[in-house]
From Swiss-Prot:
InterPro entries: RuBisCO, RuBisCo_large_chain_AS, RuBisCO_lsu_C, RuBisCO_lsu_C_sf, RuBisCO_lsu_fd_N, RuBisCO_lsu_N_sf, RuBisCO_lsuI. Substrate binds at N123, T173, K177, R295, H327, S379. RuBisCO catalyzes two reactions: the carboxylation of D-ribulose 1,5-bisphosphate, the primary event in carbon dioxide fixation, as well as the oxidative fragmentation of the pentose substrate in the photorespiration process. Both reactions occur simultaneously and in competition at the same active site. It comes from Medicago sativa (Alfalfa). One of its GO terms (biological process) is reductive pentose-phosphate cycle. This is Ribulose bisphosphate carboxylase large chain.
Amino acid sequence: MSPQTETKATVGFKAGVKDYRLTYYTPDYETKDTDILAAFRVSPQPGVPAEEAGAAVAAESSTGTWTTVWTDGLTSLDRYKGRCYHIEPVAGEETQFIAYVAYPLDLFEEGSVNYMFTSIVGNVFGFKALRALRLEDLRIPAAYVKTFQGPPQGIQVERDKLNKYGRPLLGCTIKPKLGLSAKNYGRAVYECLRGGLDFTKDDENVNSQPFMRWRDRFLFCAEAIYKAQAETGEIKGHYLNATAGTCEEMMKRAVFARELGVPIVMHDYLTVGFTANTTLAHYCRDNGLLLHIHRAMHAVIDRQKNHGMHFRVLAKALRMSGGDHIHAGTVVGKLEGERDITLGFVDLLRDDFIEKDRSRGIFFTQDWVSLPGVLPVASGGIHVWHMPALTEIFGDDSVLQFGGGTLGHPWGNAPGAVANRVALEACVQARNEGRDLAREGNEIIREATKWSPELAAACEVWKEIKFEFPAMDN
């Protein structure tokens, strides 16, 4: 090597391995308004100090690597490194703690949820010094929020499009979710919408299979929507699942839905990914479509208490990436959801400003700076007896989705839809009159059965159905 091209180490460089905490544990650091803040539940290997484990998380999810490198001298680590700035114990867990990490905003590409996750959780979860790691929450700074479009329409625009106010929206997933022909599927959609539902839904398992290709389903569902609208005088919709094996195919399905004039399409945002979801959300905004989001695969990521990622993080990411509805559990049905925690991330989806509240699992105050809100969808094992609790828990800005609780009605799909609509209207009226839904809910439903035989039949069928299992998370 000639003298002109030879590169020598600077005087300050010293090769070798040193503790992460010497560089990345900074308890005196004052967080900035522009920092992305993360709360990790850390379970270190035996013998690894909390400060070292927290610093390792900060390092490996930002600028650090396992050994000192001479190119550190070519940049400013103080400007770009993540910092573990606080550690606190987890009540009742001697081997776990919460590590708070601050990331400079310059580490992240504008408007890119996928790269935010690539940086923060992409590599560090396999780190050998940790037995387990869970991302509990993120604080997204206003400066970064403003680089995202968010939901294609938002709650208020959706209500204006549908001309429906003052109550939750009602939906239904068509069952059986697999095996119906397109024509029979469309018939079920029509019956449910005619009976009083606002929406029906493709199950996430439905895309384009030999028994029902997507184009045929879209056509028969559109026919059902227009027929039900003509008969009821209400705007109706069906969540047409645009999820596909390629982004090109996904967009083709969304374009066809727009050409049919239907109001809403659907997407499985976790299985397909944030890049595809953001692309579809942008198309929906530009073309006046609502976007319903299913969270298929979420429990693979969020169900374990000490490893993975809490759903509140996935919910925040969805609001940034774009979606007008997202499934959020029920609290009372067959799918998991503890009340305070569920309402914590429901508020993160809907509200513009949310205060820190650890009792609801909210680690950071979050300001969405007018990013449109997302309607939470309560779905899974719910029926008419749950209506008072669902109305009281989720309030007006929600979608209450009854699949088996509609199509399982002994008289058929349309009477099942009637039963749900009557139950909802009764609960909303009782609430508006000042009655206590939590205490008087069953009485309110029984009173409504006197003038709705459809509701009376539904109440008789599901009077003994309960799903009583403890929640996994707290």
